[in-house]
Amino acid sequence: MRVGVDTGGTFTDFVWEEDGELKTLKVPSTPGNPAKAILQGLERIGIKPEVLIHGTTVATNAFLERKGEDFVLITTKGFEDVILIGRQTRPKVYDFFVEKPKPFVKEENIIGVDERLSAKGEVIKPLTEREVKRVLKFVKRKGARSVAVSLLHSYKNPVHEVSLAKALSTSMELLLSLSHEVLCEIREYERTATTAINAYLSPILKRYLEALEEKLSQTRVFVEQSNGGYMPISLAKHRAVQTILSGPAGGAKAGLSLARYFGIAGVITLDMGGTSTDVCLIKSSLPFTKEYQFDGYPVSIPVIDIHTVGAGGGSIAWVDEGGLLKVGPISAGADPGPACYGKGNDFTVTDANLILGRIIPEFFLGGEMRVFPERSFNALTKLAEKVGLSPLETALGVVEIVNTNMVRALRKVSTERGIDPSSYFLLAFGGASGLHACDLTRKLNLQGFIAPKLASSFSALGLYTASPVFDFSKTVLLPVEDLEKIKAEVENLKKMALERVLSFGVSKELINSLKAQVFLDLRYRGQGYELCLPYQENLASAFHEAHRGEFGFCLEHFPVEVINVRVRLTGEDEPLNLKVESQKFVFSPFEKEVYTKEGPKKFKVIPWDELKKGDKLFGPLLIVDRYTTLFVEEDFLAEVKDGLTIFCYPKRS
């Protein structure tokens, strides 16, 4: 049996299949020990899965909180400050108070090695045995268990990195992150930062995965990567940097599958959980970037282009020094959680939805978890006094602010990139998104929104259906006309990729099923950026056309060069199954008063499981599932389609 498990900041979600039906479970996360929630969930399910595909936030949270492990960074002499200086690019050009990202590497843990290669990979200054001994002595003195090695031009010739790695691994037990293995590409700052982040996080992830592996000794555990595919646990222990968007990637992958199932050209996914919201614009295929900024630092490996904002059900409402009401980015998380959980006293978005009548206390988590509306109201009263509004006005203000924060995130991936969102659907999933989708759809003038039946566990569904993906790249710096050399580099990288995957412990049977996709990074000679295109005939013409589409112009008579060759090995995804479990969460429909911007209104409350394909219902409605609620305003039409997936359309004037 196969299980997809997504560990979020507030809840841990499970998806598995029995007798042809998808089943789900949601349990509170245990941030101090994420494995505990996984084991509790599996115990409740009562199964010992053969395969577990895990979306994890262990490495992500460790970096955001700067709780990784101290490591030694080895660089070429004279380049010790590269990681500290960074790039001069300013995220906000006119901001006079730009803050540099919080450092994660200690300056005293950086050592420069007296060696040098040319840009062509030729040895200018050999790495001497004396230098190697000096490095070994330095690492031993620091007591580090993790080491990052990023030498100048090692992407062209890794000879010195390999020599250092051999000496280090022979003399002591270390986790080694070598830049020519982590990111075999030009640009020393990006390569160094990516390698250093990996060294900082891998010990944390390795300990966590080993503990999980020990508890699940009869289960093959795989870890979801930021590129939407999973990798074996043996590789994940050494490649923590590849898991920074582990959970959200599962949601984006499932979003693409659902869009294809219903024949929809474009969707913007909205994954609103308890801690944050992840958005991703999908048009026919997953969007990838290799310029991802991870809390101020570049991670230049291929990741799904997902934008995250600190707006979730657990986002705390607070008042700043000027008396303005704010929401997030700090979250109450799973413990103590929103005030209504009975442990904390902070008023959150979940508390606001509860007070406004959008969440029904008796149905929270299918009635499995008791909530305390009176605690929400007590926290709201204190907040309202600070703001100077009535409690209900304050609760509405909290919802309006968090919606505005999410609209800003949605515009970040659409209008700010020159894309008109009005032809797109919002794909709303995550436990909280259904309560906010109507307002977001209206604010962005979208076609409508889609709410899958497994909305609250949708990312776990993406993990359940995931396949293995392995990305490899190499800088080649060749003119686009040099077709023979380009072809040779492609074939060499393919061969190396298969050898590397075999070394990860992947079975030959699985390797034989992998399909190779080849991409090239191209640019006009002298440019400082590239466009990634599939390997094809007439590369120059294809690049001119892509450049015109991206930037509005092209230089047809200007030389084009291939910077990087990329090979992606992919497996076959599990087919998307929309048949949900027959064990229904039902109740007799009733009416309930819900407070809206226009005042109190009567909403009909109906169980999601009582709907059937073809049903069309007009709001105002609360459609309640075991783990989520859909808030349908009166100017929206809800239509039920395959798998009890609900399409909601706004009335057009």
Regions from the PLM with identified roles:
Residues 34-35, 41-45, 180, 184, ...:
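ATP-dependent carbohydrate kinase catalytic cores
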Residues 4, 13, 45, 50, ...:
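Conserved phosphate-binding loops in N-terminal lobes of ATP-dependent enzymes
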Residues 130-134, 138-141, 264, 274, ...:
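C-terminal, non-catalytic interaction/recognition modules in large multi-subunit enzymes and RNPs
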Residues 150-195, 199, 566-585, 647-652:
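Terminal amphipathic helices with adjacent charged low-complexity linkers/tails
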Residues 5-34, 103-120, 370, 467, ...:
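Short glycine-rich, Thr/Ser-proximal phosphate-binding strand/loop in the N-terminal lobe
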Residues 15-18, 23-26, 50-89, 148-161, ...:
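Short beta-strand-loop/turn "lid" adjacent to the catalytic site in phosphate-handling enzymes
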